[in-house]
Amino acid sequence: YDWAPPAVEHQGRADIDGVHYILAAEESVRTGAIVSGQADIARQISAPQEGLLENKGVQIISHGTNSINNQLGFRFNHPFLQDKRVREAIIHGIDREEILRVLFSESYPLAQSSVAQTGLGFKDQSAAYTFDPEESKRLLDEAGWKPGPDGIRVKDGKRLVLRSNTALPQPRSKEVMTMVQDQLGALGIAIEINPGDQATQNADAKSIDKVQLYHIMVGRADYDVIASMYSV
C-alpha cells in the first residue's frame, strides 16, 4: 500500500506490515494475550478486568456507541405497558447509578438520553431518568396496581410480571438485569429474566408475549437510528 489520499498527513508506505486478527471467545484468553505481548489490542474487556490490565500498564480506551445507548426498550403494545404511568414507574424505579457503581467502571458514563452523547441528534434528557422510588409507587397506585399478598402488584386479578431478554453480546447484561429485577421487585414489579442461549433469546425477542422489556443497544451512526427501536 503506497497510495494514501492527498488529505492524509502520512504519505508513502504504511507504517505497519499488516493487521492480524485472532478470534478468542474467552475473555481470559484476550486479556492474557495482551498482557503477555502476544497481542497489541484486545476488544470487549469487561469492567472488572480493566483495573488488572491498567496495573499491567495497558491503556484502556473506551467510546460510546455513536447511536443508541445500552437501555431497556418498552414494548408498549403489551397490556401492562400501554399505560404511560407504568412505564414511568419502571424508569424511576431503576437506580442506574447503583448499577454503574456495582457492575461497571469509569469507562461507562451515565446515559443522559436514549441517544448517546456522541450520537447525531443527542439532547440531554437526564431529568426524565431520575431514580425516585416513591414516585414509582405513586404512579403504580394511580394506575390501579396495588400490592398483592406476596408484594407483587395486582390489577384486575393479574400480577404485574414482565419478562426481559438477556442481551448476551452486551456488557454484563445478565448482571444488569438481575439488579433491575431486585430494584423493581422492591416496588412490586416482578421481572422474569429469559435464561436461554443466544438462539433462544433471538427467537423469543420476536414475541411480545415472551419479552416485554428489551435490553438493546444500536451501534449505527445514521441520523434516524432511533427508528430501530420501533421494530422490537
Q: Which functions belong to the PLM regions below?
A:
Residues 1-26, 49-68, 146-149, 154-156, ...:
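Aromatic-rich, solvent-exposed beta-strand/loop patch
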Residues 7-9, 82-182:
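Append "and occasionally in soluble cytosolic enzymes with long acidic Gly/Pro-rich linkers
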Residues 11-22, 158-164, 182-196:
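A local structural motif
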Residues 20-78, 85, 89, 97, ...:
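Extracellular/periplasmic solute-recognition and catalytic clefts
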Residues 34, 53, 140, 180-185:
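Hydrophobic alpha-helical packing residues
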Residues 38-41, 89-92, 180, 184, ...:
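Exposed, low-complexity coil/turn segments of extracytoplasmic
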Residues 44, 146-149, 185-200:
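Short, well-structured beta-strand/strand-turn elements
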Residues 113-114, 201-232:
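Acidic-aromatic pocket-rim loops
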